[in-house]
Amino acid sequence: MEHVTEGSWESLPVPLHPQVLGALRELGFPYMTPVQSATIPLFMRNKDVAAEAVTGSGKTLAFVIPILEILLRREEKLKKSQVGAIIITPTRELAIQIDEVLSHFTKHFPEFSQILWIGGRNPGEDVERFKQQGGNIIVATPGRLEDMFRRKAEGLDLASCVRSLDVLVLDEADRLLDMGFEASINTILEFLPKQRRTGLFSATQTQEVENLVRAGLRNPVRVSVKEKGVAASSAQKTPSRLENYYMVCKADEKFNQLVHFLRNHKQEKHLVFFSTCACVEYYGKALEVLVKGVKIMCIHGKMKYKRNKIFMEFRKLQSGILVCTDVMARGIDIPEVNWVLQYDPPSNASAFVHRCGRTARIGHGGSALVFLLPMEESYINFLAINQKCPLQEMKPQRNTADLLPKLKSMALADRAVFEKGMKAFVSYVQAYAKHECNLIFRLKDLDFASLARGFALLRMPKMPELRGKQFPDFVPVDVNTDTIPFKDKIREKQRQKLLEQQRREKTENEGRRKFIKNKAWSKQKAKKEKKKKMNEKRKREEGSDIEDEDMEELLNDTRLLKKLKKGKITEEEFEKGLLTTGKRTIKTVDLGISDLEDDC
C-alpha cells in the first residue's frame, strides 16, 4: 500500500500521547495524510477549524486524535456523566464507522467512555446505557442527538451533561445540510457552551456550509487540502490513485453488461449504486439469482433496522457485492473496495465524486465505472469541467449473455418480482425527471421502450409520465398479469382474499349503478305523477268559489263581533248584520239552483 504522506506523527509540533502513537501503529498508519498534518496542530492549539479535503483523505483521524489529546490535557478529569466531545455525522453507517475507529484509541484509555447514538435503535435503551456507563465522547446522528436533548421523562438531563464540552465536530457538514438537518443542528448548538473548540469537515464548500461556519465557529482557520502534484486551478476532486471509467450502452443492454462484469470479478469487493430504493430491491434480487458464488447484500435509506447489521457484515467481507443507494456515498470507509459501479448516475454532480471516493481511500488503489445511455454521453465532459474528474472509456463487451428473458421468467413465476420491477421502473423515471443536470438527463429524450425492456417489464405501468405515449418497440407479454401468483403462499393467500373482497365490492357497486339506471328509465312515470298532482291542484283552485264565499262570510261575522265588543254597534244591529250576511249567501246559492232547474 502506498500512502500520500506528510511526515511521521512524531514530526507534529505538539507531541502526541505515547498510547495514541501506539494505537496508530496498531492501525497501520505510520504517517500522516495532508489533511491530518494540516488540521491536528491547529486543533491542539485550541483553534476552530473549517477543513475541506477530497474524499478518502483521512479526515476521521484528523479530528479523533485532537479530541483525545484535548481531553487528556484537561485539568479536571471528566466524570462518567460529563460529555467532553460530540461528533455529529449525517448517517448511521458513518457514525458506526467513526465509533469503531474511536474505540481503537479509547481501549488504551479506560478513563474515557464513548457512546453511539443513532436511529434504528431503542432510544430508551440509549438513555439507560448513558446513565449506567456514561459517555465522555458521543458519536451521533443529528436527529437522535436532538431527541436526547429533549428527553426529560427518563431522568436524562443532557443539557447539564454537556456544560463540560470541549470539542464539537461536524463531519460531512455539506451532507448534513443537504439532508435537511440544519434545524436540528441549530437546536443542538443552542444547548452547547460557547467556550468550545469546533471542527467542521467537508468534501465540498458550499454557501450553506459557509453559513454554518459563521454560526457555529469562532474565528476559524480555513484549511483546504488538494491532491499533491495537481495545479490548484485544475485540482481534481477524486483521489489521485482512483481510475475512473465510463461505459456507453443502451438501456436494454446495461443490465447484461453489469452482470457480465460482476461474473468476471467475483473475487473482488464491489459497491453497485442505483438511483432509488426500489431499484436496489429489484436488481439486488435479480443479481442474487444471476451472479452465483458471491455474497450479495442490499442496503438503502428505507431500511430502518437492518442497515447497521448489513453494513458491519459487508465491511468484514474479503469479497462481495453491496447493492446500494447514495446512503453509502459519503464518508463511509469500507476496507479494500476494488470497484465502485454506478449503474445509474447520481442526481447531482458532487454525489458522483463521493460515490467514486468509496474506493482508493487513504492511498489505496481503486477503480470506478459509470454506465451511461447514448443520450447522456455529454455528462463525461461535464464531469471533467465541473468536478475536475476525467474519465476513460471502457467499451461494452460483445456477445454477452442476454439475461432479460430469465428476469422476465422470474417475474412471471413470482408476483413479488413482477411488482418490484414495476415499482423500480416508476421510481427510476420519477428520479430521472428530478435530475439536477436536466440539460443532459432529459426525460423527454428517454427511450421508454428500451428502458422497459432493460427492466424486463411484462407490461408498461400506468403513470403520468407515460400518458398519451405509444410504444411500438415494446411488446408486452401475452399474459394477464393479475393472474401471476406470489411464490410466498401466505402472501398469495392474502392477495386472493383481497381480490375476493374487491370482486364483492365491484358487484355491489354495479348493483348501485343499475339502480341508478332504472331510476332514469322510470322518468316517464315520474313525469306523469307530477302532471297528475298539478292537475289536482288546479282543480282545487278552480273549485274553491264556495269556500271563498264561506271565508268571506266568516270574516264579516268576525268584523261585526269586534264592532259589538267595542260598542260601535248595538246587539240589534249585530244580529241584523248576521242575518243580512246569511241571506246574501242563501240567495246566491238559491239562484244557482234555480238557474240549473230552468236549464233543465
UniProtKB/Swiss-Prot annotation:
Its main location: nucleus. Residues 500-513 have a biased composition (Basic and acidic residues). Keywords: ATP-binding, Helicase, Hydrolase, Nucleotide-binding, Nucleus, Phosphoprotein, Ribosome biogenesis, RNA-binding, rRNA processing, rRNA-binding. Residues 514-537 have a biased composition (Basic residues). Residues 254-402 form the Helicase C-terminal domain. A motif (DEAD box) lies at residues 171-174. GO terms for molecular function: ATP binding; ATP hydrolysis activity; RNA binding; RNA helicase activity. Belongs to the DEAD box helicase family. DDX55/SPB4 subfamily. This is ATP-dependent RNA helicase DDX55. SUPFAM superfamilies: P-loop containing nucleoside triphosphate hydrolases (SSF52540). A motif (Q motif) lies at residues 9-37. Interacts with 28S rRNA. Interacts with double-stranded RNA substrates in vitro; the interaction stimulates ATPase activity. The keyword Nucleus applies. SMART domains: DEXDc, DUF4217, HELICc. Probable ATP-binding RNA helicase. Has ATPase activity and is involved in the maturation of precursor large subunit rRNAs. Its EC number is 3.6.4.13. ATP binds at residues 53-60. InterPro entries: DEAD/DEAH_box_helicase_dom, Helicase_ATP-bd, Helicase_C-like, P-loop_NTPase, RNA-helicase_DEAD-box_CS, RNA_helicase_DEAD_Q_motif, SPB4-like_CTE. Residues 40-223 form the Helicase ATP-binding domain. Residues 533-562 are annotated as: Important for nuclear localization. Changing residue 60 to A: Loss of ATPase activity. It catalyses: ATP + H2O = ADP + phosphate + H(+).
